[in-house]
Swiss-Prot record:
Co-factor binding details: Binds 1 pyridoxal phosphate per subunit.
MF terms (GO), sorted A to Z: O-phospho-L-serine:2-oxoglutarate aminotransferase activity; pyridoxal phosphate binding
UniProt protein name: Phosphoserine aminotransferase
Reactions it catalyzes: O-phospho-L-serine + 2-oxoglutarate = 3-phosphooxypyruvate + L-glutamate; 4-(phosphooxy)-L-threonine + 2-oxoglutarate = (R)-3-hydroxy-2-oxo-4-phosphooxybutanoate + L-glutamate
Modified residues (N6-(pyridoxal phosphate)lysine): K195
GO biological process: L-serine biosynthetic process; pyridoxine biosynthetic process
Subunit structure: Homodimer.
Pfam families (alphabetical): Aminotran_5
Organism per entry: Coxiella burnetii (strain RSA 331 / Henzerling II)
Chief place of localization: cytoplasm
Domain of life per record: Bacteria
PROSITE patterns: AA_TRANSFER_CLASS_5
GO cellular component terms attached to this protein's record: cytoplasm
Amino acid sequence: MSRVYNFSAGPAAIPEEVLFTVRDELLDWHGIGMSIAEVSHRGEEFIGVAEEAARDLRELLAVPESYHILFLQGGSRLQFDMVPMNLLANHKKAVYIDSGVWSNLAIREAKNYCDPHLATNAKELNYTGIPDQATWDMPNEAAYFYYVDNETVNGIEFPFIPDTDLTLVCDMSSNLLSRPFDVSRYGLIFACAQKNMGLAGLTIVIVHDDLLKRSPLPTTPSYLQYALHAKERSFINTPPTFAWYLAGLIFKWVKNQGGVAVLAERNQRKAAKLYKFIDKSNFFDNPINPTYRSRMNVIFRLADERLNSLFLKEATENGLANLKGHRLLGGMRASIYNAMTEEGVDALINFMGQFEKRHG
């Protein structure tokens, strides 16, 4: 069997060691004679899997005990609604940063519930960076301050945590577990699993206990209330058990790699070498301000975009899959999440160099 280097933005590459474990356990999990995908979500087997996954994630991210970790369904887009539904309380205003495609969608959704106040808008920079924080328009009062830590489509990543006294809410869908950060700075963090934590269909929410005391909007369905999910330990109904199990395996893998700090160093090396090659090239270009370049999603364009199809065809033939850019931006995108090896990035750089020699 020959596996390719998968640069998909999501669902994304899964560590091979994890896939081998899934293969070995799929028919008979730990000698029980059936798959973990077949057991009751309320049985002792899966309860053990779920609790261990939560403990491991808490340890990896140093999540204080004053936070609940929820394993929810619905993908990150559902959080665009759940956040205002649960956190607005008596406020009419929430603060947002428009840094790219995903924050823009969250802002549009928030308008159904409140007046989203833009602290700053990266559109004025053509989404190639974030305006200086000294220029942000920050109100003294608001329900929360929302931003996207890494914009997967635009290739922008925050190199800092915004300085604010407001309750900080962050979409970390594409870079959670990619570097250490201070969880205690945040009120709520959410991330879908299909980038760095496994399968689509699972979203992890880390929420401070104080926020669970806020009264949801009157029209909020019970299933969309964080407090109820926390009370029921994410077991209001049948959770996505296999995705939860796989996330737990990935948390074990991260621990075996040496933890989040070790992965952060590796991720920085991967991104740095790819950006270095692009910057030296006269054929490939990345428009993002270097300060805000994403370590997870490297976007680039060819000097002659008529060669895009040929580039993708030859890349696929060379075992480099899913490099096509997002439909809204075009061009190319190499998503190099935790599971992407340095060898995979080296193979991409080598191919790009050879392609430039032939067509540049």
